Each structure stands twice: as C-alpha cells, then as structure tokens.
C-alpha cells in the first residue's frame, strides 16, 4: 500500500473514531436514564429501629458508565441503650447485559453482602431494591421515592427468615441533593 493511501485511510479511521466513542458513551449513559435522578451527592436524616441518625450517600457512574457506585454512611448518636456508632456501606449497580434489568450488590461494615434486583416503577419516581429470597436469611427491601427535583424519601425494610414478603420498616429517611 502506498504512503498516500495509508495516510488517507488513517485520516478516515481517525475521523470516525471520536463519533464511535461518543456514540458508545451516549448509549452507556442512556443505560442509567431510569436511575438518573439518584445521581449525585445527598444528605439526609431519619430514624427507625437503630435510632435517629443523619448521614450522606452518593451515586456516581464508574468504569466508564458501566456501573453506578453508591457510597453511604449514617451516624447515630449515643443513647441510654448503646454508644454512638457509624454505619458505612458500598453498593455497585450493574447490568449483566445491555438488555437486562439492573441489579446491585451491597457490602457494609457489619459484614453484610446483599444481592438485589432493581425495579423501576412506571411512574419513574419509585425505585425498589429487593434482595433474593434465601431460606434461612432475612430479606431486604430499599425503596427510593422522588418527592421533588432535589428531594427524595427512602425506606429500608426487613422481612424475617421464612416470611419473605412480611416486610417491616427498619429505617425511614428524607434526603436532599447537596
């Protein structure tokens, strides 16, 4: 191949490459459109069985938009029944294929590892993370409800082993975007 043809081929390929990369990036960005309102940094407060607490969480894309990473902490002041403590967790939201529904895996400082399926309700305001049914383990449900442009509520519920649909509220909170 002569040098002129190689240069023209290189220019053609180089000209197409940015469009291909941009197109691929836009496709990946649209993969998370249904979860987009969760993206960003949030501050919240609420309470439940562990007591009244306050904390922060964030959802940010990772691995070139292939996953969403949620980092969270909640701080609880001391009470007459227990000392002050802090709960930290990390969740990775992913899709096993481009057409699959999102799933998540959760880890926390207490040693929990929870696999969730994620349902986005038709109203596009409610997102529900529900754990697998495991015979001898509790089942968990975490629900986010968009209440405004920069506000949401969340509810974390637990169902006892053997009663996978008998959820009771463990924590309820309100959050606002930072």
Language model features by range: what are they?
Residues 8-18:
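Bacterial N-terminal signal peptides
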